[in-house]
Amino acid sequence: MIDDAAPPYVGRFAPSPSGPLHFGSLVAAVGSFLDARAHHGQWRLRIEDVDTPRTVPGAAQDILATLERFGFEWDGKPVWQSARLDAYRDAFERLRAAGQVFPCACTRREMADSALARDGSRLYPGTCRNGLPPGRSAHAWRVRAHGRIAFADRIQGPQEEDLATEVGDYVVLRGDGQFAYQLAVVVDDAAAGVTDIVRGADLLGSTGRQIHLQHLLGYPTPAYAHLPVVVNTAGEKLSKQTLAAPVAALPPARALFAALTFLGQNPPPALGRASLRETWKWAVTHWSLVDVPRQLQAEAPGAFSARARENPSSL
């Protein structure tokens, strides 16, 4: 049921152009798109190319073409993070003026023996929190992490995180001058008026930091829903690094049917022989977030876990 008193729904899909879309990317796109359309809301598209060393030339255009081929329709023009550096700089300067960030001289080697944070990274020990050591220059700028962050994930349920002990002071401006993902995504979501974020559970560990930044910058906090991450038969997340096959080579209607099945929507077998248009129509009408499996990851069905250069012959 849609709450008429709630603000207009604005969702988004924000792929990184580090390679072509794979089945895991498709699942995230399908989940966010259907939740937006089922709420009669907007679905925005953002290309997260702020991390220029990871950006592959031509990948963004390939992503846009694949989404169009699969029948996705987004609202407004795609937003490119590389065109929004001034907005990130303004947000960073606000944090610095408020004393919420500090320069850090620590290298990865110096932090190698630190305790592990919740997401598997090294927990920052606070070495530079009260000033740089004599003779050292800043390699990055970090946010002073403090307090507990709690939120109700629409799929994964109640979440709580102590920033100081489970995350530590986190980077918002890197030594190479690149703004960190956490800052860029928060600024972009606020600028677009995003009310609901539906994405993979691999980003669940980033949510506490993003809510923290929203509080510091005076931004509203969207509702969050984290879908199970798609993994291959070895239990690895589908990605460029694990040689996930591009979905562009797959029949769109069959791939969409598989994504709906993965998301617990229980599409009828006859839909597997329907056209792409008919499949989308059924999916929007029957979308149910409560039926999405409440788990952090699940294996891709059959040939959809195939590696690049393998032939998905079962399709």
From Swiss-Prot:
Record flagged with keyword Zinc: yes
Disulfide feature: none
Pfam families linked: tRNA-synt_1c
Cofactor(s) needed for function: Zn(2+)
Cofactor note: Binds 1 zinc ion per subunit.
Positions bound to L-glutamate: R12, F13, A14, P15, S16, E48, Y181, R199
Protein's GO biological process: glutamyl-tRNA aminoacylation; tRNA modification
Binding site for ATP: K240
UniProt entry keywords in alphabetical sequence: Aminoacyl-tRNA synthetase, ATP-binding, Ligase, Metal-binding, Nucleotide-binding, Zinc
Domain of life according to the entry: Bacteria
GO cellular component, one term: cytosol
Listed EC numbers: 6.1.1.-
Motif 'KMSKS' region positions after renumbering to this chain: 237-241
InterPro entries in the record: Glu-Q_tRNA(Asp)_Synthase, Glu/Gln-tRNA-synth, Glu/Gln-tRNA-synth_Ib_cat-dom, GluQ/Sye, Rossmann-like_a/b/a_fold
Stated family: Belongs to the class-I aminoacyl-tRNA synthetase family. GluQ subfamily.
Entry-linked HAMAP family: Glu_Q_tRNA_synth
Protein name: Glutamyl-Q tRNA(Asp) synthetase
